[in-house]
Amino acid sequence: YIVKDIEKLADTIREAFQIAQSGRKGPVLVDITKDVTAAKTYFESMEPAVIHPVCETIKEKSVKEAIEMIEAAKQPYVLLGGGCTLSDASEQVREFVKKIDAPVCDTLMGKGVFPGEDPAYTGMLGMHGTKTSNIGVSQSDLLIAIGTRFSDRVYGNAKTFASRAKIIQIDIDPAEVNKNILIDTAIIGDVKAVLTILNRRLSQQQHEAWMQEIQDMKAKYPMTYHQERLSGPGLIEKI
């Protein structure tokens, strides 16, 4: 948006906030000219903007494909992104992870959705991620990406990322599918709504050998720091 008339400023800001909070939430640019910022006008308060709910168009075919892939997997991995936070889907995520018995990694925007003290959690993925998460995803046969846009800091080299795995992407925005990483199937819809369906229809999975392999990897590659000098983690630990 660009606002050149002070009389249009209030309506434009209102519309921008409405768009920012509807569907896939995100920033909206409003460019206001200098003369408008210095101008004066009469403002009449309005009712709060209506936030449009997400139109649920979750396709049955996509759900069936995802369930078949999950139940056929031997070494699944779950990747959580910011969409899980925006959807307030922490409870559904925890139930899903328990149901499919898989390790979990996340992006920076997805941190806090899944409890960090849970044995299934392996830390962040990608450039700033843990060795366990990066190796684990590279060895997985199914990656379930939930509410993440696959930024380059997560996947690194697109040609070699999760090269052994089939990929399921769950996202509210169809424009994010196959944008950075080619996937095998996608479920378009709100994360909480999609996971609620999957949790209800999936059978309980067991991957004891795979989960033990991940635990061994976490023990082999722990998150450590130099204790002989002052560091952020050391200070937090002392506090």
Task: State the predicted function of each range.
Residues 84-168:
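Glycine-rich, anion-gripping cofactor-binding loops and their flanking helix/strand elements
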Residues 1, 51-57, 117-129, 180-193:
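Short beta-strand elements at the ligand-binding edges of bilobed clamshell
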Residues 7-8, 31-119, 211-239:
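Cofactor-pocket helix-loop regions in the catalytic cores of large enzyme subunits
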Residues 1-46, 69, 134-168, 236-237:
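Structural signature of the thiamine diphosphate
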Residues 7, 164-239:
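Phosphate/pyrophosphate-binding active-site segments
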Residues 13-14, 90-91, 180:
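Conserved strand-to-helix beginnings and helix N-cap segments that scaffold or border functional pockets
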Residues 37, 110-115, 151-152, 174-178, ...:
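Short gly/pro/ser/thr-enriched loop/turn and capping motifs at secondary-structure boundaries
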